[in-house]
Amino acid sequence: MSSSFPNGTVFSLATSYAATKTVTAISNATTAVASSVSHGYSAGDIVILGNSSRLDQRVIRVAANAAPTDLFNLEGIDTSSTTLYPSGFGVGTASKVTSFTAISQVTDVQSAGGEQQFYQWVYLEDGRQRQRPTFKNARSMTLVMDYDPDLAWHDDLIAADLAGTVYVLKASLPSGAVIYYSVYVGFDGEPSFTINENQKTVLSVSLACPTSTRYA
């Protein structure tokens, strides 16, 4: 049993990336291994994947490699199921994060989506309703910050909004754990005008990959 508060969590946006590398394969294993010629990744590097599988836009950490230099391990990623990860699923790209900008003065964080949806039906002969799960709603997060256009994150978030591409968002928890998300950024940088309150500005992100990645 445990109890944890998010107080002290720091969110950061990845603002620069190394050149994209081609991934030619990902193994079916309890710890997946990716093949990429001269990738140059080291243990601890944060990488976002791009392919046509369940790992598309998934953020991963590179594990210690006891393998040839053209291979790198995907820490905590289990691809042993050939049903979920059929042959050829891993062909795609990988991009390493090279810097993050911390988002300060956050006063509120809200999450939405992820609700399980169902298909329901009734057979004429017995009149009983049945249901089975279908999909989960797309997920999003909203961060409210005290407005300050002189802080680095302000212009970085505007640039990410204008780019319209996928970014890595990091949540560094007070326990030392880290959660990574791949997101589309929505931010116009405009302040609120509520009397007798700090001016606020709102960051909205939609998750490109519905599954976050957590590392202790």
Label every PLM stretch briefly.
Residues K170-Y215:
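Short beta-strand and beta-hairpin "edge-sheet" elements
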Residues R130-P149, E197-S212:
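Oligomerization/assembly interface segments of phage tail-like spikes and tubes
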Residues L13-T15, L49-S53, A171-G176:
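Short acidic, glycine-rich loop/turn motifs
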Residues S2-F5, S16-N28, S36-H39, S52-D126:
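Small/polar beta-strand repeat architecture
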Residues M145-V178, G186:
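Acidic, glycine-rich flexible loop segments
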Residues D126-R130, D188-G189:
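Short structured motifs
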Residues I46, Q57-R61, L71, V178-Y184, ...:
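Well-ordered beta-strand positions in beta-sheet-rich domains
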